[in-house]
């Protein structure tokens, strides 16, 4: 009897091991530049959710802790573990070439996401793709949103000069999103015939605490009573600005962000933020996962999906969000 039980246990263990080994056949290595980035945290959780819906796929997740050398080491380990594809959120976009050479050495496809590699890097490897957004579009849509509200709220023009006096919280200098959003939000306002005057601009590195400190300094400076609009390259910094404005009893000054994080949508609902721009984390995650899974299985990158690939890139569109359409995004 005991021998039969042992034999049955061995068979069950073998079956379980076989199932595990089968799942491991479609291993995908994923790196996130840092887990505690507000937006990338949403993307990461969405990728993990997509992974759970595909039982034949095993995701090997890594926090690169904002350290490119650490990410390079993680990629070496993932390749040594035999992953069939890589999904890489670069710490430094300039490191794409290094990552590609590692992947090429093992003939492993790589899907970059959120931080865009150079055209040269993408073109250097036939199995390299990118999922992200059009950085310019986010700035244009944010500009449209500000213009809409500026024209509807004459009281925002504190000195009645017909010109927006603004401060701008910029993301990481050199980051394509930070540079494009900073340039195109102002350009779009000017293209719409709205004059602008920059009172202050500084980087807060996408970070809420740094943005609060920058905003606090501006609200304690000589231009404190001239600020009419606060523009932030992302919601995390917009939330820091909201905290500083509240501390200075200036919550009536409108704040605009980008990302449509749940916390920011709550602030739009309460009126603490005037608007944001949906940076579609769920669809960026889904496209990244779908492409990586297809490539890991030896299929065409977009096979069986609705994603449109142009020049090896999937662009996920942005959408402006304010109180007028907020309900469309808070019911998800």
Swiss-Prot record:
Spell out the SUPFAM superfamilies in the cross-references. Periplasmic binding protein-like I
Binding annotation for beta-D-galactose? 37, 114, 175, 177, 181, 234, 259, 279
Q: Could you tell me which Gene3D superfamilies the record lists for this protein?
A: 3.40.50.2300
CDD domains from the UniProt entry:
PBP1_GGBP
Q: Does the keyword Cell division apply?
A: no
Q: Where in the cell is it found?
A: Periplasm
InterPro entries documented for this protein: Bact_Solute-Bind_Prot2 (IPR050555), MglB-like_PBP1 (IPR044085), Peripla_BP_I (IPR028082), SBP_2_dom (IPR025997)
Q: Where along the chain is Ca(2+) bound?
A: 157, 159, 161, 163, 165, 228
Q: Signal peptide location in the record?
A: 1-23
GO: which molecular function terms?
A: carbohydrate binding; metal ion binding
Origin, by domain of life?
Bacteria
Q: Name one GO cellular component term.
A: outer membrane-bounded periplasmic space
One GO BP? chemotaxis
- Positions binding beta-D-glucose in this chain are 37, 114, 175, 177, 181, 234, 259, 279
Which residues carry the site feature described as Interacts with membrane-bound trg signal transducer?
Answer: 97
Which keywords has UniProt assigned to this entry? Calcium, Chemotaxis, Metal-binding, Periplasm, Signal, Sugar transport, Transport
Q: What assembly does the database describe for this protein?
A: The ABC transporter complex is composed of one ATP-binding protein (MglA), two transmembrane proteins (MglC) and a solute-binding protein (MglB).
Functionally, this protein is described as follows: Part of the ABC transporter complex MglABC involved in galactose/methyl galactoside import. In addition, binds D-galactose and D-glucose and plays a role in the chemotaxis towards these two sugars by interacting with the Trg chemoreceptor.
What does the record's free text say on domains? The calcium-binding site is structurally similar to that of EF-hand proteins, but is in two parts, with the last calcium ligand provided by Glu-228.
Name the protein family: Belongs to the bacterial solute-binding protein 2 family.
What's the protein name? D-galactose/methyl-galactoside binding periplasmic protein MglB
- The source organism is Salmonella typhimurium (strain LT2 / SGSC1412 / ATCC 700720)
Its gene name is mglB
